């Protein structure tokens, strides 16, 4: 099969490409955003017509954290709607047999009953901070369902839980929870051990606002303290700089650490994506309704943020303290997907959170130079 993976440079898209190759697929088509602007309808349609594809996987999207979603809502809804519409409609016009649309668990109402079943879609109000993005993702599901109903296509949708893994975004200001925790604790460990070479390499590869390659150690400490990575002072108020001992460092994280979250390694997500695409159409239709066809992808288990932090602390090898700033809001107390349909369709995750976090940290250290900054 000739498969086009849209968004192959992102965390999810790159994982899908790796998994496809691992499973023996060799005819994989990719285009960078500079080669193909997915918001340009005519260019997308021409590309799909010319390639003669058997399958399209939509892992491309404009994504970002709470601040970005809240600050640029027009960009989030417009770009995501255009990407989805151009690829779905263009695939139909080009006679593409199969398509897989990757959404997000933010499609569900903010006060959904737990665990969240697929049928809870459109049953309540969305989280206001990312509503435009969520509406675009819901539209992607409905595009696939509508084309299936009207044109008899085989376009499928999956909704992953919180993802993490290689090629994630580790920017301190706009990354998701796991990469943010990993990088903060990594930098804290470097301060703890007075490894200024590693700290400056990290800043060079992943810029931090207010810092440059020639910033002094004290300037670095001052800026990192604003990010919650603090070297504590001695009794005489001088910063500890003796390499013969571990410096006393603490990491401050927002909230109580009590919220429960579900985390899925992106390689498991990629495996689930291919599994869903490979399922016979009749078998899939026995589990999903034509107008409620999306499938949750997750682990079926959740964990407190505090427990995740302790695992990361151990994986990184940080000996300092973790402090939770309880004055900051926690957000949703619990967010867990019901994966009953996924399990009945024969798929379960295999990567444990501990193993996944260990692998992700190793990747971060090894590939620091290529970590993307959004």
Regions found by a protein language model. Name each.
Residues 7-11, 15-23, 186-374:
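C-terminal substrate-binding subdomain of Rossmann-fold SDR/epimerase-dehydratase oxidoreductases
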Residues 41-81, 93:
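NAD(P)H-binding glycine-rich loop region in Rossmannoid oxidoreductase-like domains
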Residues 77, 81, 129-141, 171-179, ...:
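Short-chain dehydrogenase/reductase
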Residues 85-130, 156, 169:
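Conserved Rossmann-fold NAD(P)-dependent oxidoreductase catalytic core, especially the SDR/UDP-sugar
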């Amino acid at each position: 099969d000739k498969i086009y993976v849209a968004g192959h440079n992102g965390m999810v898209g790159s994982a899908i490409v790796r998994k496809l190759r691992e499973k023996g697929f060799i005819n994989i088509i990719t285009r960078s955003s500079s080669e193909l602007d997915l918001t340009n309808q005519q260019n997308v349609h021409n590309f799909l017509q010319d390639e003669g594809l058997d399958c399209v996987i939509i892992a491309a999207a404009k994504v970002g954290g709470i601040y970005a979603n809240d600050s640029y809502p027009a960009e989030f809804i417009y770009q995501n709607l255009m990407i989805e519409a151009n690829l779905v409609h263009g695939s139909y016009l080009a006679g593409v047999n199969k398509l897989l649309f990757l959404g997000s668990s933010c499609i569900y109402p903010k006060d959904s009953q737990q665990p969240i079943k697929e049928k809870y879609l459109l049953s309540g109000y969305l989280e206001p901070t990312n509503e435009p993005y969520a509406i675009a993702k819901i539209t992607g599901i409905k595009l696939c369902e509508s084309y299936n109903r009207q044109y008899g296509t085989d376009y499928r949708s999956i909704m992953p839980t919180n993802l993490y893994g290689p090629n994630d975004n580790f920017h301190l200001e706009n990354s998701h929870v796991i990469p943010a925790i990993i990088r903060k604790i990594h930098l804290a460990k470097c301060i703890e051990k007075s490894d200024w070479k590693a700290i400056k390499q990290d800043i060079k590869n992943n810029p931090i606002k207010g810092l440059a390659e020639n910033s002094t150690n004290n300037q670095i400490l001052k800026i990192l303290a604003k990010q919650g990575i603090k070297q504590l002072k001695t009794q005489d108020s001088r910063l500890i700089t003796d390499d013969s001992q571990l410096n006393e460092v603490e990491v401050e994280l927002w909230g109580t650490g009590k919220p429960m979250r579900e985390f899925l390694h992106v390689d498991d997500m990629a495996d689930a994506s291919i599994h869903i695409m490979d399922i016979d159409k009749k078998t899939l239709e026995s589990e999903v309704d034509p107008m409620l066809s999306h499938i949750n992808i997750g682990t079926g288990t959740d964990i407190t943020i505090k427990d995740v932090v302790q695992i990361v602390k151990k994986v990184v090898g940080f000996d300092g303290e973790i402090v939770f700033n309880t004055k900051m809001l926690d957000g949703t107390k619990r967010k867990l997907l019901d994966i009953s349909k996924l399990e009945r369709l024969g798929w379960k995750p295999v990567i444990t959170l501990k193993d996944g976090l260990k692998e992700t940290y190793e990747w971060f250290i090894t590939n620091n130079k290529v970590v993307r900054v959004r």
